[in-house]
Curated annotation (Swiss-Prot):
<dbReference type="InterPro" id="IPR026849">
    <property type="entry name" value="ATG2"/>
</dbReference>
<dbReference type="GO" id="GO:0015031">
    <property type="term" value="P:protein transport"/>
</dbReference>
<feature type="compositionally biased region" description="Basic and acidic residues">
    <location>
        <begin position="163"/>
        <end position="172"/>
    </location>
</feature>
<comment type="function">
    <text>Lipid transfer protein required for autophagosome completion and peroxisome degradation. Tethers the edge of the isolation membrane (IM) to the endoplasmic reticulum (ER) and mediates direct lipid transfer from ER to IM for IM expansion. ATG2 binds to the ER exit site (ERES), which is the membrane source for autophagosome formation, using basic residues in its N-terminal region (NR) and to the expanding edge of the IM through its C-terminal region. The latter binding is assisted by an ATG18-PtdIns3P interaction.</text>
</comment>
<dbReference type="GO" id="GO:0061723">
    <property type="term" value="P:glycophagy"/>
</dbReference>
<dbReference type="GO" id="GO:0006869">
    <property type="term" value="P:lipid transport"/>
</dbReference>
<keyword id="KW-0813">Transport</keyword>
<keyword id="KW-0256">Endoplasmic reticulum</keyword>
<protein>
    <recommendedName>
        <fullName>Autophagy-related protein 2</fullName>
    </recommendedName>
</protein>
<dbReference type="Pfam" id="PF13329">
    <property type="entry name" value="ATG2_CAD"/>
</dbReference>
<dbReference type="GO" id="GO:0005789">
    <property type="term" value="C:endoplasmic reticulum membrane"/>
</dbReference>
<keyword id="KW-0445">Lipid transport</keyword>
<feature type="region of interest" description="Disordered">
    <location>
        <begin position="137"/>
        <end position="178"/>
    </location>
</feature>
<dbReference type="GO" id="GO:0000045">
    <property type="term" value="P:autophagosome assembly"/>
</dbReference>
<dbReference type="GO" id="GO:0061908">
    <property type="term" value="C:phagophore"/>
</dbReference>
<dbReference type="GO" id="GO:0043495">
    <property type="term" value="F:protein-membrane adaptor activity"/>
</dbReference>
<keyword id="KW-0653">Protein transport</keyword>
């Protein structure tokens, strides 16, 4: 029975007891009401707990106040606690350090509370109570030690065996006290009741924001059998952000006035809490709060067993029932990122500490499993009636009847009866019932979805869902970043939660603006044992315009694998070098099949893109950091290491797809057909920062039209190659890199109309579109581009070893570069042979084996393209372009290049206005009385008077000065003289040719700001080699059949017919076959000789050799070629709106700095067919050829077009050999009907105006044969072949032609203008070039000057002393050179006659000039593969090196040596001429000596005297003629040296004219 004390003693006793309880050590007695007795009551007002003595793990208690706390303790041991307005403010600790001396212990507080309630004996005084302090502290330390070891566990065990062993040495009184306290505590706990109202817990993570947990009411009651009942009403969790408008708070104002009071009341509080308290109570500061509701729990009822004794705080048989939970996920996503960082950091600290407890260790759990030690008496049951997640303003998720049951061995069973996904905008709900059944056993979570999951999403729902996913991803990145920053080494074997998932069929239905998308998935199965998620099939269906569902994507056999250890996949880098991709997530897909219409796909893509753009419209752009170190892990390997270096790339996820098949129906439009895309052996890697890596082993794109397949991109796989075809990389900042290898791209001109229409539509749609920041870098290696023309069947292939394309769409610039390109051509793509399976060394060899012919190469090409609102501008620079063509391949190439564009033709109704609406009176504006006598006056009667006459100079030009003519001028003649004398010409008069003909485009042509296409092509060097023979099998076969037909027809002639009557046949408009019956056997031999240069063989030739010749016949070289094209769109105008103004549709300018045509015919001794006339006055730097072509539309309302042409050509030097001329005519006149371009509406180009400058020509012509049949037919041009021209001069006069109907009429018009002019005024220059008359005319002119000059001087001054020497000097200067040249020609002619005579008598003839040696001192094959020139001669006479090292560049197997002119390699001066003359004479004498010596040697073998005489007779002509040949050659060399000494200009002329026999002249062998 309690004893009674005075009120003041009771308070003092209570104060002492409360000071022993750490929580109440700061209690003020003035706020305490005490009543001790059988029903003791304690009333506390405005209690501020001592927070310094409260130390929770990772938690710092900043403030703890209770407005009203009532404690009632009865004699029976019932403890009732009731409180109101409880506020607790805590803050997580930044560091994880804990001080064990200040740890809060619930047991310690309970012991202190119990000690104050003990019924002490009457002799008990306060001193004895003080003496008990030491023993009590020791016991408290034991309690603290035991609680610190398991303070983080769910079950709190106060009693610890280690503490019992330690306390065995304590005194007996202490043990008795301890036992008494435990009994009292156990009694109190068994009858403990508590009720708290208005409980608020504030968790401060930042100075301006905190988490507030508010509870309306908490009730704890006891039931029999140690059952506790906890009822919690209305739990609410808010995020509160404080906003203080006043920027500065005075520190002095925050401090209390009474320092002692401050020390007693606020000593344990931080400066923040003092400031917060001051803010809350200071009326001068306006405090606002931004509050977000995160979680609301309506009513919770918790029943548990435990807390029965002080020795056992275990909680078991826990039964939790929750009525309603409301979670605002959208408010959670609005929390500040820094605040979320602090929350995650605090949670990580708690998780880390809980993992460090002994019971959570791996060893303890293994010990628990091995010994079958499970806490079977603990049970947990959780029931939640309703859970609502407010995901977004449009989305909410409702869960009903959630049940969790814990069974034996810590196994849990979870049931979720119903899930409802609500669209708050349309009030549509998706209900899934029964929804989920889950099991948790041994850290394995098994999820079984019990019904089919059919989801339905509308547009607003999808937008909200995407936005939520993005925000969630942002929060997860924040969490992962925080987690990785505090990441500790992972303990091996630590158990993580494992999952197993099984679903029914899953479908997602998305409603867009005008369509639905339905995604159907087979059951999803995930097994944690294999770490694989498997889906057998996924189907994507669409019903555009709300029509019938149509399947367009099918995904087969999807397997997603998760691995704790890195998975390595083989990949390739940008250099196609092997590397490794490393990941822990691998997705394998067997097949993806896509079938859809293209226009539907565009609509679907637009709808999806609109939703994505709207969902991400308000998202701020995230700045991506450069991360490169984590992508490549390399190891430095020394030379001695045997490890093979392999680059490694890290990836978040790798997707492996065996096959991708895509088909786009009605691609672009119905005319295109279907587009089929195929990808095999694909690998896709998803990296950080949204980087993507992809490779494909094979790639193909085909066009499918009317069941016929047209390849657009095909893969060229070599059997030896394992490299991928395509590598794709998406980098940060919208950078795309594409690497392509071993593919063939096809260009079809027939697709241009479709693409042009598509491009027009895209321009209309994207006219207002903004430029995107996109960078594309494409590297193409070992790739072929096939060009297919519009109407004909040939194909041109360009093979690139390496092609680079870079595009910057922000700047609208594109760059293309390739170093080497090879050109191949075929006459019919259908004749291409089937490729063999044998590996090929190069791509060019692959196509050569399939029937293509190599026609050229192109090197170092750079293309720059720039686009803007005005149009497209492209600039192309090419270092060199080389072509090797035959007549048929040249014709094929030209037709193909023309046919690569769209053939645009129009009917006459669209081109011309053929109907006149009404009669036109042509005399309507004619003054019929203009020429009446009344209007005609005599010239003498003309008087200038009355008014001043103003002559305006700007009438013809832009001058604005006016000249006033005085009235006093009486006559026109006097006026003219006075005007000339008064106006002196101070500046030279500048005359502008063709001023009147100049067209002012500003006044006649309509220019507007419109789109244009500008193309500029610069080629430094173009080499075109023209070969004889034919590339195509069709051509060769046609010619062979024609030759055989002619042979058969002429053999069928009767015997009495004329044997010399010829039979003619023409094929391909250029090949003329003629033979007679007597010469039919030599027909094929002559053809071989003309084409291949083969000598006439002895024997029958079964087949003519029409293959391309082994060496080219003519070489065309062009240097610094510039082509500038500017095109404007053809804007169709309505006739009523047309102003009948002209419009320029396109303009082409072609400029060639220098060009030459090299003669390499075996029968020609001349070198340059066409070159620059060096000695004419032509400005330096002016191009040899310049032209301009303008295509104009005279009337805008009509489609008729006309051409304006202008040519400017430099003076030309021509060396024309008849054989070369015949070859060029035969080459360029070749026409194959297979390549004729036939338009729907044939049109002849009308040339509105043609202008050309005056061209001077210096002509050398060497005829070889005369066509007498042509003469008999009336072809007078054959008379030219009777004369050899040497330096004939003629001039093609400048001309202007108007209204020419086509190029054939242009040729006739030029002939009609130039021929009469040459005949009438230039015959002197031509006759002066006739070879037999040239020297005589020149000498005659010199003799004429010898006489005329003295006579002229005598008439002037009457003296002859000075005029005669002057005339003699002129005569010697002009005639001496001609005399010398005439002598040299006579000597060379004599040498040629002697060589022919010697050859007639069995000598070597002209072949004796060079001595063939068996050794090949120069391998021409190494210089040029196509020419294969072999042979040469390098003679030595008595150890003297020859003057010139001779190469016979045209000598072939079964071929003839090239004919070299006697005028080639002339000595440069007199000294060199005499030296060459000496060596020539010596060499020929040595030849004669060897001939006689060889005959003498053979005479010893001969037995018959007759044979000896015959042998001597054969040797005699050679011995006699060969020295004469040497003498004439020596004389010729000496005279040539003298001639070149007198005239140095002849040296350059001879180099241009004659082929050189020296090795220095490499043009003919390159």
């Amino acid at each position: 029975m309690p004893f009674w004390l005075a009120s003041n003693l009771q308070k003092k006793l209570l104060l002492y007891i409360l000071q022993k309880i750490s929580l109440f050590s700061n209690v003020d007695l003035s706020n305490v009401d005490v009543s001790l007795g059988s029903n003791s009551k304690f009333a506390f007002h405005d209690v501020r707990l001592n927070c310094d003595d409260i130390d929770l793990p990772n938690i710092e208690v900043k403030e703890s106040t209770i407005q009203q706390l009532d404690l009632q303790l009865t004699v029976s041991g019932v403890l009732n606690i009731s409180g109101e307005s409880v506020i607790i403010v805590v803050k997580p600790k930044v560091d994880n350090e804990s001080n064990s001396s200040k740890e809060f212990s619930l047991a310690k507080s309970l012991h202190d509370l119990t000690a104050s309630m003990i019924q002490f004996p009457q002799s008990f005084d306060l001193d004895e109570i003080k003496n008990m302090k030491t023993n009590q502290n020791e016991y408290d330390n034991d309690i603290i030690g035991s609680s610190s070891s398991s303070g983080n566990e769910n079950d709190i065990d106060i009693y610890n065996s280690s503490s019992d062993e330690k306390n065995e040495k304590e005194s007996e009184s202490t043990g008795t006290m301890k036992s008494m306290k435990n009994k009292i505590l156990s009694s109190v706990l068994s009858k403990f009741k508590m009720e708290l109202k208005d409980v608020i817990l504030k968790v401060i993570l930042q100075d301006s924001a905190y988490i507030e947990i508010s509870i309306d009411k908490v009730s704890l009651a006891n039931k029999p059998d140690d059952i506790r009942t906890l009822i919690i009403d209305q739990v609410r969790i808010d995020h509160v952000k404080s906003i203080v408008e006043e920027q500065e708070i005075s520190f002095n104002r925050r401090m209390p006035n009474n320092l002692e009071q401050s020390k007693s009341l606020y000593e344990s509080n931080s400066l923040y809490m003092s400031a917060l308290d001051e803010i809350q109570h200071n009326p001068e500061i306006d405090l606002k709060e931004d509050r977000l509701e995160l979680l609301v729990v309506k009513h919770s009822n918790i029943t548990l067993t435990g807390l029965s004794t002080i020795e056992n705080f275990n909680l078991k048989d826990l039964d939790i029932t929750v009525d309603h939970i409301l979670c605002s996920y959208k408010n959670l996503l609005c929390i500040d990122e820094m605040f979320f960082d602090d929350v995650m950091g605090t949670l990580n600290s708690f998780i880390s500490n809980s993992n460090n407890s002994p019971r959570s260790s791996t060893a303890y759990k293994r010990f628990q499993i091995e010994n079958d030690l499970y806490e079977n008496d603990r049970k947990l049951k959780l029931s939640i009636n309703t859970i609502i997640f407010l995901v977004d303003d449009h989305i909410s998720v409702s869960l009903s009847n959630f049940n969790l049951d814990q069974s034996e061995k810590n196994e849990f069973k979870i049931n979720l009866e119903l899930m409802k996904l609500n669209d708050l905008t349309t009030d549509r709900s998706m209900v899934f019932s029964p929804f989920l059944e889950a099991f948790i056993s041994n850290s394995v979570l098994t999820l079984n979805f019990l019904s089919d999951l059919d989801f339905y999403f509308e547009k607003d729902f999808i937008i909200g869902l995407i936005s939520v996913c993005q925000k969630t991803s942002k929060l997860m990145n924040t969490y992962n970043r925080k987690k990785n920053a505090n990441k500790r080494p992972r303990e091996p074997g630590r158990n993580n939660i494992k999952f197993s998932i099984t679903t029914k069929n899953v479908s997602f239905k998305f409603k867009l603006d005008q369509s639905y998308i339905l995604i159907r998935c087979d059951p999803i199965i995930y097994d944690w044992k294999t770490d694989k998620l498997a889906i057998s099939k996924i189907e994507f269906l669409n019903d555009l315009n709300l029509q019938k569902l149509e399947r367009f994507i099918t995904v087969d056999s999807l397997i997603l694998k998760f691995s704790n250890t890195p998975i390595q996949c083989l990949a390739y880098d940008e250099h196609f070098t092997k590397c490794a991709l490393i990941t822990k997530v691998l997705l394998n897909i067997k097949n993806i099949c896509f079938r859809y219409q293209y226009h539907k796909l565009l609509q679907l893509y637009g709808s999806i893109l609109e939703i994505i753009d709207e969902a991400t419209r308000f998202e701020k752009s995230k700045k991506l950091s450069k991360r490169g170190s984590h992508l490549r892990n390399t190891v430095r390997i020394m030379n001695s290491s045997s490890i093979i270096f392999k680059k490694k790339l890290n990836a978040n996820t790798i997707i492996s797809i065996d096959n991708i098949d895509a088909q786009f129906d009605h691609f672009l439009n119905e005319e295109f057909g279907k587009m089929v895309l195929g990808l095999k052996n694909n690998l896709i890697a998803l990296k950080e920062n949204s980087e993507v890596y992809m490779l494909s082993k094979t790639l193909s794109i085909d066009r499918l039209l009317k069941e016929r397949r047209y390849p657009i991109l095909s893969c060229l796989l070599n059997s030896n190659s394992q490299e991928p075809t395509l590598i794709f990389e998406k980098k940060v900042r919208n950078k795309l890199k594409i690497y392509i290898k071993n593919v063939c791209l096809h260009y079809y001109a027939r697709l241009l109309p479709i693409l042009t229409k598509m491009d027009t539509d895209l321009k209309k749609e994207n006219s207002d579109a903004d430029h995107n920041s996109l960078f594309i870098d494409i590297k193409i290696s070992n790739t072929a581009v096939v060009l297919h023309p519009f109407r004909i069947k040939p194909a041109l292939i360009v093979i690139f070893d390496s092609l680079s394309i870079s595009s910057d769409f922000l700047k609208c610039t594109h760059k293309i570069f390739f170093k080497h390109g090879c050109l191949l051509l075929i006459d019919d793509i259908g004749n291409m042979k089937v490729s063999s399976k044998q590996p090929w060394s190069s791509l060019s060899n692959y196509y050569l084996q399939r029937g293509f012919s190599a026609i050229g190469k192109i090197t170092n090409t750079n293309v720059n393209i720039k686009t803007d609102c005005n149009g497209v501008e492209a600039t192309t620079n090419v270092e060199s372009l080389g072509l090797s063509l035959c007549a048929d391949s040249f014709n094929t190439l030209i037709s193909l290049l023309i046919d690569l564009k769209i053939p645009i033709t129009f009917p006459d109704e669209d081109k011309y206005n053929i109907e006149v609406p009404e009669d036109v009176d042509v005399f309507a504006d004619v003054d019929m009385s203009f020429f009446d006598p009344i209007h005609i006056k005599e010239t003498e009667e003309l008087i200038i008077g009355g008014e001043s006459v103003h002559v305006v100079n700007e009438f013809l030009d832009d001058f604005h000065d006016e000249v006033e003519i005085s009235e006093k001028v009486a006559s026109p003649k006097k006026f003219f003289n006075d005007y000339i004398s008064s106006h002196r010409i101070t500046q030279p008069l500048e005359l502008e040719e063709s001023y009147i003909d100049r067209v002012d485009l500003d006044t006649t042509l309509e220019f507007t700001e419109m789109e244009f296409t500008a193309f500029n092509l610069d080629i430094k060097k173009i080499s075109i080699k023209l070969f004889d023979g034919y590339d195509w099998k069709y051509t060769r076969k046609s010619i062979s059949n024609t030759i055989d037909m002619v042979g058969r027809e002429i053999e069928d002639y009767e015997a009495d017919d004329d044997q010399n009557q010829p039979l003619h046949a023409t094929i391909f408009d250029s090949i003329y076959i003629s033979t007679t019956k007597s010469d039919v056997s030599n027909l094929k031999s002559r053809v071989n000789n003309e084409i291949q240069g083969e000598s006439n063989p002895t024997g029958f030739i079964p087949k003519v050799n029409l293959k391309p010749s082994k060496y080219f016949k003519t070489l065309i070289e062009l240097n610094n070629v510039n082509i500038n094209f500017t095109g404007y769109p053809n804007q169709e105008l309505v006739e009523s709106r047309s102003k009948d103004t002209s419009t320029i549709l396109s303009n082409i300018k072609v400029v060639v700095d220098t060009f030459e045509v090299i003669d390499n015919m075996p029968t020609s001794t001349w070198k340059k067919f066409i070159t620059l006339y060096r000695h004419d006055k032509w400005p330096t730097g002016l191009p040899m050829f310049a032209s301009e072509f303008s295509l104009v539309q005279p009337i805008n309302s009509l489609q008729a077009t006309e051409m304006i042409m202008a040519l400017n050509i430099s003076p030309l030097r021509l060396h024309i050999d008849q054989d070369t001329l015949d070859f060029l005519l035969r080459f360029f006149e070749f026409r194959d009907v297979r390549f004729e371009l036939i338009d729907d509406f044939p049109e002849v180009l009308f040339i509105q105006k043609f202008t050309m400058n005056s061209v001077k020509i210096l002509l050398d012509y060497k005829p070889k044969k005369i066509n007498y049949s042509g003469l008999r037919s009336g072809h007078s041009s054959e008379f030219v072949n009777f004369f050899i021209l040497d330096g004939a001069k003629l001039t093609l006069k400048n001309l202007k032609l108007y209204g020419i109907n086509g190029f054939e009429d242009l040729s006739d018009s030029l002939k009609n203008v130039w021929t009469p002019d040459i005949i009438s005024s230039q015959l002197g220059g031509i006759i002066g070039g006739v070879s037999p008359l040239k020297s005589a005319i020149t000498i005659g002119t010199s003799v004429k000057k010898l006489v005329s000059v003295p006579i002229t001087d005598y008439k002037q001054d009457g003296k002859l002393s000075r005029s005669i020497p002057k005339a003699v000097n002129i005569f010697l200067k002009t005639a001496s050179g001609d005399f010398v040249r005439l002598g040299a020609k006579m000597a060379s002619g004599t040498q040629a006659m002697l060589e022919n005579t010697e050859e007639f008598f069995g000598g070597t003839g002209s072949a004796g000039r060079t001595f063939a040696i068996p050794e090949k001192f120069l391998d021409i094959n190494n210089l040029v593969e196509e020419d294969q020139l072999v042979g040469g001669s390098n003679p030595k006479v008595k150890n003297h090196r020859p003057v010139a090292v001779v190469i016979d560049a045209s000598k072939m197997e079964l071929g003839q040596p090239k004919i070299v002119s006697l005028y080639a390699d002339q000595p440069l001066d007199v000294r060199e001429g005499l030296e060459e003359a000496y060596h020539s004479l010596e060499r020929h004498l040595f030849i004669a000596y060897n001939s006689i010596k060889n005959r003498s040697t053979n005479m010893d073998v001969l037995e018959s005297p007759t044979m000896t005489v015959l042998s001597m007779a054969k040797a005699a002509p050679i011995a006699i003629i060969r020295p004469l040949i040497g003498a004439t050659e020596a004389l010729s060399k000496a005279l040539q040296g003298i001639s070149n000494q007198l005239d140095k200009n002849q040296i350059e002329n001879n180099k241009d004219k004659y082929k050189s026999t020296t090795i220095i002249d490499r043009k003919l062998v390159e």
